[in-house]
């Protein structure tokens, strides 16, 4: 049987984050979601988690750090409206350096990708390299993230893990350190070698 690629000569090249690392700063945000504001990024689940935390009268600061693509703004406008209703700060169309600084002021990134976290998620790598604890969903390619992110099976499970973290912040230090080490090895310079 003939294949398109010779597997002995083919290698999968991992990705790295385009967001640089930044020294950790005084906390400004408890939780953020960031990336391109478009469908299929888990933004609705992030907003749902914020809404549930607000219902429980938990004090926290949240932000949506996002890039609004120029084509169809109807989805972005809906998300912006929902964030505003939940008192989630909107930080739109920031540079990579600005995003790095914002992440350095953040505790948790809620990144519930519908297909689960995987090595192709540059936003998760950007959070990890900036020492932000990543909360995401399990997926088919999530096994290597079991010890470097906090994974849930669905949004309710993720919410319970966020609530646990809020009350036990020190219990996740090892995961955060491991995530930083993982992401540090996944920079473009290392990949190019």
Predicted segments, located by residue:
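A short, active-site helix/loop in glycosyltransferases that binds the activated sugar's phosphate group
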Residues: 1-10, 19
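Short beta-strand->alpha-helix junction loop in the catalytic core
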Residues: 12-22, 67
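Conserved donor-binding/catalytic core segment of Leloir-type glycosyltransferases
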Residues: 24-41, 47-50, 176
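A structural motif in glycosyltransferase catalytic domains
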Residues: 31, 46-49, 62, 127, ...
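Nucleotide-activated donor-binding/catalytic signature segment of Leloir-type glycosyltransferases, i.e.
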Residues: 66, 76-97
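Acidic donor-binding loop of glycosyltransferase active sites
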Residues: 103-118, 132
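Conserved acidic donor-binding segment of nucleotide-sugar-dependent glycosyltransferases
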Residues: 146-156, 163-169
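A charged, aromatic-enriched C-terminal amphipathic alpha-helix characteristic of glycosyltransferases
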Residues: 169-193
């Amino acid at each position: 049987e003939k294949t398109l690629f010779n597997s002995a000569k083919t290698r999968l090249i991992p990705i790295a984050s385009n967001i640089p690392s930044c020294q950790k700063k005084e906390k400004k945000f408890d939780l953020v979601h960031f990336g391109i504001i478009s469908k299929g990024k888990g933004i609705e689940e992030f907003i749902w988690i914020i809404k549930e935390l607000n219902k429980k009268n938990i004090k926290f600061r949240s932000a949506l750090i996002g890039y609004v693509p120029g084509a169809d703004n109807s989805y972005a406008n809906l998300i912006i409206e929902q964030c505003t209703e939940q008192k989630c700060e909107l930080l739109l169309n920031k540079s990579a350096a600005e995003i790095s600084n914002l992440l350095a002021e953040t505790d948790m990134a809620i990144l519930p990708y519908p297909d689960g976290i995987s090595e192709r998620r540059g936003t998760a790598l950007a959070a990890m390299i900036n020492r932000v604890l990543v909360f995401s969903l399990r997926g088919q390619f999530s096994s290597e993230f079991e010890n470097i992110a906090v994974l849930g099976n669905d949004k309710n499970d993720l919410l319970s893990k966020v609530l646990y973290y809020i009350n036990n912040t020190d219990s996740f230090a090892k995961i955060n350190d491991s995530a930083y080490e993982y992401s540090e090895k996944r920079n473009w310079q290392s990949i190019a070698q």
